[in-house]
């Protein structure tokens, strides 16, 4: 019984990244995205340095182009969990926040050549806090203690978890205008991952509990305890290539980002797993110095835009993320059947040149 409970707790902690945001791609890197979701065929503004870098060859005139934007994102993640068999009926409230999401774009165009750069947060889920723990905490612990004959009303359970994940990226590249209608881009992006988890769990006896070997477990005795304080860092490189073609009022942009091999390394200050009757141990995945694969998947972007009028434009865009062929913690990619498909479409009215 004790072995099963220990495994349950370990599984519980491993699943926490899902609630901290996981390895997500942040598509929105510029306020213009809120007006037009499909940016992959953009050739008129500097944010194309990320969404359609080959299209920078068709910027209106030679010279420097720069853009700095700061956005904020806040979200509540609430869970209403109940399980009659486990005696679980509780409402959990979590708060996720990314108060500062900076993006910097720059490009210099001279004739047929354009050099461009970008800095921003391209992945991660920001910060998430669950002050009353997670339903998984309670369910796993309740299940483990029930297997040892300890009913839910016989103990009190307290837990909390804070998590954060960010991927900071710097991209540089060169665009060349091959013909009057075709251009190409080649460059690369350096990605730096920083994140971590800090939390605690304590299940203690609420009444005197009988021991199988005789005697009793006094009120207040810790039955299960977890303390974790682990920060994680890592880096990886993403090669990027792109093409852009203009056929009158029709623009087609394509970009391919190769897979970035990224391993994150633990810098663990606290890692304690305790269960009554067993020696103190550690959570294997969060031991100091352990490396975990968290690759950034290859991504294909294809977009088309058509300008009906000088003030009216329609665009569509397709993204494919090859999640199946990357390295993930615990080999999670083996359970995927395919990658992720994303579709964006939008009609846009350009009100003035200040956008």
List each language-model region with its residue ranges.
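Conserved small/polar residues in nucleotide/adenosyl-binding loops
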Residues: 345-355
